[in-house]
């Protein structure tokens, strides 16, 4: 660890964030770690993203990015969408997830990758695995440029007829494995279907890190899919978020849990930069708080305070 890093770490102070967790804020300015949020679209005009949203990307199988192609990078790439559409149920998810991410640690930067297209009629186009592949491929290529620490994608499906074919034979595996080899985890939701027998696709992919939700009492929420053989970590599932246009709301689900888990990983990487992927994973496991409910036992609730000591 060089003198600059030591001096920076010495200036870290503990603060309590808007979502009620402890995070780290810096008074010095080395290269900040970035969390990539892959989702629907983002209201980049919101004050919460000022100085935090450092890159927008659009990556889709279809030619539905704002520039009329299947790829776009730069301001407006993920946010050029009519406000009435952005506020709709089909597209407001991304802004909410990004707001949770930036609220979980005041020091982490945000990169937003849009993978959901809008049809000519203003409806949500289908989201494909190929779009996610393009997004992850961009992350691999830009990991060093933006100091990317983790990826959060709060998208999933529990009712695929091809579920058993996709897990664990998804085309995403190669890209998730590559990111793991460069110390970047891909965090995915367990899903919210009250099903303790399995988690959503693509969270079922073994190479990914699957995140479930606990309630305000740190008990595993009944809606949180899977069990600890399938779910790597748990974090609170009911948190405050911001909708497009700036209205504050409360969101509940494993989608929210994914965002804080990804930021917690980035926080550990920031405080302990020499740790590898496997070392951070084991540290989060070793310092976690046991969690359970009446049907699911031995879950691992991330304890970021212990993990960053």
Mark where each language-model region is.
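Bacterial N-terminal signal peptides that target proteins for export
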Residues: 1-9
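Bacterial N-terminal signal peptides
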Residues: 10-19
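Sec-dependent signal peptide cleavage junction
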Residues: 19-30
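Active-site core segment of subtilase-fold serine proteases
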Residues: 28-109, 117-119, 134, 141-147, ...
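Extracellular S/T/G-rich loop segment that most often corresponds to the catalytic His/Ser-adjacent loop
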Residues: 33, 39, 200-270, 274
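Structural recognition of the beta-strand scaffold that forms the well-ordered cores
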Residues: 34-38, 109-114, 147-154, 185-189, ...
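Substrate-binding/access-modulating region of protease and related hydrolase catalytic domains
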Residues: 116-205, 217, 246-259, 293-296
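C-terminal subdomain of the subtilisin-like protease fold in secreted/lumenal serine endopeptidases
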Residues: 146-155, 170, 182, 207, ...
């Amino acid at each position: 660890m060089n003198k600059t890093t030591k001096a920076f770490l010495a200036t870290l102070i503990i603060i309590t964030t808007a979502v009620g967790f402890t995070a780290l804020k810096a008074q010095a300015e080395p290269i900040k770690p970035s969390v990539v949020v892959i989702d629907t679209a983002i209201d980049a005009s919101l004050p919460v993203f000022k100085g935090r949203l450092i890159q927008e990307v659009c990556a889709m199988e279809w030619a539905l990015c704002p520039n009329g192609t299947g790829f776009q990078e730069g301001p407006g790439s993920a946010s050029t969408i009519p406000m009435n559409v952005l506020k709709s149920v089909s597209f407001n998810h991304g802004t909410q997830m990004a707001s949770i991410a930036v609220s979980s640690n005041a020091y982490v930067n945000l990169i937003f990758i849009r993978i959901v297209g809008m049809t000519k009629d203003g409806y949500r186009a289908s989201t494909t695995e190929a779009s996610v592949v393009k997004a992850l491929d961009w992350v691999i290529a830009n990991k060093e440029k933006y100091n990317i620490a983790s990826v959060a994608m709060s998208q999933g499906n529990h009712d695929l007829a091809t579920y058993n074919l996709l897990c664990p034979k998804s085309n995403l595996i190669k890209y998730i494995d590559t990111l793991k080899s460069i110390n970047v985890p891909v965090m995915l939701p367990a899903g919210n279907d009250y099903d303790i027998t399995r988690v959503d696709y693509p969270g079922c992919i073994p190479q990914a890190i699957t995140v479930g939700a606990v309630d305000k009492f740190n008990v595993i929420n009944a809606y949180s899919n899977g069990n600890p053989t399938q779910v790597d970590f748990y974090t609170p599932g009911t948190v405050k978020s911001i909708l497009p246009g700036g209205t504050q709301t409360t969101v509940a689900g494993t989608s929210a849990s994914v965002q804080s888990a990804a930021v917690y990983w980035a926080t550990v990487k920031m405080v302990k930069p020499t740790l590898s992927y496997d070392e951070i994973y084991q540290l989060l496991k070793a310092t976690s708080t046991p969690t359970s409910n009446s049907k699911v036992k031995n879950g691992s609730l991330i304890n970021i305070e212990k993990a960053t000591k």
